[in-house]
Structure formats: structure tokens, C-alpha cells
């Protein structure tokens, strides 16, 4: 009985702690470098002139660049659009559809892409089992299990749920089952052990209209061929003092768990605005916030499992609201955007946090005429004391600050919103990457959780189906390939775009160093080579190195004079694929004394005497015609990762 008393006191608290009262905002610290095309107006904004140039918006970026993309063209040769979510496994990416216009089309469903050459991802097949035809945010991969749920409410009341198993041949996922869930699935979460699925319906009757409506439904997925319903839950099961505060919320929106599945994190989609549905009880009360539940009964499969309340953190803004836990001085009228995404993380400092986002109709539309009302930003919430979570910092681009409203209106500057989120390492987070709709991908460094800083952004150029005067937008969770330091992002018209950060401080693959030499056997002669490439200052400084090759049989001599790239493999390099022990080195120099450009890829397979040998690939990309690949018959190649 002690916990409910403490919680009631917390909910009624009238004073803010110093940390909660003075939230730090993430300022922009991205200094444009070579090849960048930075924003020209306020952070996150896009001017009318930029949106209406001939050929459409040309894109903007800072500290990030595109490695490759696939427009996902449909039967008419146009981008199929309606990008739902993106997932990544092995050398494969998966791109779902949010709201396909025609379920019967062969292009409708979840695209499977071969990304062994990241600069040229190839769409190889489409998964068209029932749920995969319209999977949105309830599209997850944990370990080698991939699940999807049909977005919102399925046709004829069939809320389809698919399970696939992934293996070495990730281009051909193994279908395990289709079942149905107890209610709809706008969002969903698969527990890290793959044995439990939490689904979140969206829409339908309000809790006042139907006191038995389902807010969360739980599926036992231990047997992948035969999922079993575990329980249904709604807000009426909350303690009365909490229930009465969240009744106005029409919907929950997002869900995640901690690593062992014993805690459940839910966001209340309760903004006092059109996107949040307005308060369902007509009270005008905002009910945005985070609910933490004890899900141990579910995780341990106890008889008659229950979800048990731990805490509710509101970020409805009025200072006279007796339940507020977070006050934002920019917006004190309660009309916040609707809480949207919620993700459990462990920071690199070892502490647990929840990262949340808000969304708004204005931010989704990007329309300059309403962008001043969007009230949307990301929050970092310290849950070390889960009974009293604390918002310690926010990410709020300048486009969302009220002091810029007049300029937005005058210059007709489109904005965006914080939508979904990704991380460099969920259990050792430094970087949070926001999919910000019209203001693109925004990368924020949270090394100091209370003083975050934006270090990169990317806004994609328009494609043929982008509406005149608008720009393409992104909302799926960005997914990180840690071995190759690449981000997989989804764009509503532009399809899949693979990005990388260009500062070696934030891109560990740029801090790799390679050294070695030896020879390839070519007939009766040898192809001798030597190479060295690294960045100074512990991997964060200037790039330098050398490469020499002498192929007497082919009459070819290569000499590098300048290195132009050192990082993960991204282009076609024969049998060398993007892995943690491979690098690509681009450079310019001479081929038999004449100017030329080259690509060299190497793979370090370990110590001599190992089962698999090192490998090198060399090709001329301009000024000559020469390619050589093989395993050194003598010598050694070493690839080292600098911290």
C-alpha cells in the first residue's frame, strides 16, 4: 500500500524540482563542411523560394550525406509512396507501407531490399502476407524474429498479425504464421526476447462511449506458429486519481518495454488539439504524458497476469494544473501537440531514460500557415526513480519556438515535427536520431543528457510525386547498422535512403585504420601491393595514407597521391561486403603515370593461419580500366577500429 500513497503525492505535487523547471534545449552545433548544403533560414525551416524552384526542392544537409537510395517504384514506374516503417537485418532492409491505395497491387506490401551494396540498394521481392500488406509502426525485428500487424483495424474485423523468421538468407524470410489480435494495431512492440507482443489500437470508440474498449492488448508469441492472446487492458484499470486525469485522452499511441520486459512504457496521445482528437470529455483538459506500468506478470507468465501502475508523468503545460510534472515556458496554455513515440534506452552513463516525441497536425502538414501552433518537441526523461520520472532536456528546433512565429508567417516557412526516433545503441545511447517529417532527419548528441546538441541533419530532395511547393517528409524510426555506421531512413515519396554522418567523432567507421601489404598470385607473376590509411588525432583528424600496386603481367602501376574517403564499404567491391572488419578507401593518383581515380576495398579476416583469408579489391573508377581482386598469397592486411 505504500506505493499508491507515494504516487498520489507525486501526482498532486505543486512545485517543480530545479531540474524540471529549467529544461535545456538542444541547440544546433552543425558546422557545414565540404559537400554540405545547409539550411538558409531558421533551424528546421524551409522557405517558399526553396520549395518552388524549378524541379522541386533540391535537399539540404549538414554533417550527413546520402550513401544510396531506392525510390521503390510501383507498377506505373512512380514512387509507390506511403512509407510505413523501415527495419534492418544482416544485409537486408525491409520497407513497409502505411496506407496503400490498393491492397491488390503486387507492389503493395513490405519490400525486401538487398543492401550488400549500400550505394545501390535493390528491391528484390515483396512480402504480401495479410499483415505485411499494410504494416506501419507495429513492424518490429528482435533477434531473428520479424513481426508485423495490419495498421489500425483490419478489413472485416481481422486484425492480422504475421510472424517471420530471419536467417542467413535474409532476402527470403521464413513465414511462420498469421493470426489475429484482440483489437487494432496502430503501433506495437515485440519484447527483446521475442516472446511477447504489445499492440496499441488507435481510433474507434472513446472510453466514455465504450468503457470496455481496449487500450493495450498482449499476445504470447513464444510459439511462433501459434500465438496466444494473454490479456487486454484499458485505462479504467488505473488508480482512480490517475484514471480521472487521463480519461480525456482519446488514444494511447506508442509502447515499449525495458530489456527484460518487466516494465511497460506507454504514451498518452492527449494533446488539446485536432490531432489529439480534442479532449473526449469536452473538458478542454490536456492529458499528454508517459505512463509506466509493471509488466512482470506478463514477462514471467504468472497466472491471471495484470499490468500494474507505477507512475504517470504529465507534460500538460498550465502552471495551475495540479498534476503537472513538466512546465514548458514557451507554451503555457495547455494546447500541446499529441504525445507520439516512447522508447526505453540506457544512456552511455549507465542510467535508464525514456525518449519521447510529440506530433501535431501542423507539423505533419508542414504548412507555414499553421506551423506556429504545432507545439512539438522531443523529451529525454530520467527514469532512475520510476515513481518520479524527470524531464531533463528537450529537443526543440527553432521552427517550433514562438519567438519565430512572425518570421514563419512572413516568409511562409514550412516546418515539421518530431515523429519517430532511432538510436546508435539502445543500451549505450549517445546519439538520438529524430525523423522530423518535413524538417527531415535530425541527429542530436545526448552525451551530456542535460545539454543536448544537434550535430547533423538531412532533408531529402523532392521526387517526381512530391506535390508542387512542398518537400518530401520522413516519419519512420531511423534504423542503425552499427557495423557499418549507416542509418536506414524512410521517406514518404522518396523511398529508402541510406545515410551516414560525416564527422568521424560520430561515425566510428571513419575512425578505422588499415595497414598492410603483400602480393596476389596472377599466373606465374605476382601483383604486389602496399597500403596504409588512417586519420590523425586518434582517428578524428585529417585523412592521410598511401596505396601502391604493381601488376607486371597486366602492365599496371597504381600510385595514390590523395585519399578522398576512408570508411565502411558502400560501393560494389566484388566479394567484399560491408562488415565491421572491412573498409573502403577511395583516392586519386596515377595509373601508369596518367591521372586516374580508384576504389580499394580490403577485408581483414584475422590472424595468419585462419580458415578464411584476407581479401583485397582494386578498381579504377575514372581515367583507366583495371580491376583486380583476390586473397593475398603472401603478406597481411590489418583493419583496426579506433575508439
Predicted regions and their residues:
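N-terminal segment immediately downstream of the Sec signal-peptide cleavage site
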Residues: 509-548, 553-554, 626-643
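Predominantly extracellular/secreted and cell-surface proteins with exposed
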Residues: 531-598
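Bacterial N-terminal signal peptides that target proteins for export
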Residues: 1-9
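Hydrophobic residues positioned within well-ordered beta-strands of beta-sheet architectures
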Residues: 66, 111, 217, 379, ...
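Feature marking well-ordered beta-strand scaffolds used for ligand recognition
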Residues: 26-509
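Beta-sheet ligand-binding and adhesion/scaffold domains
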Residues: 581, 588-643
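Short, surface-exposed coil-to-beta transition loops
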Residues: 107, 212-213, 526-528, 594-598
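C-terminal segment of classical bacterial N-terminal signal peptides
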Residues: 14-23
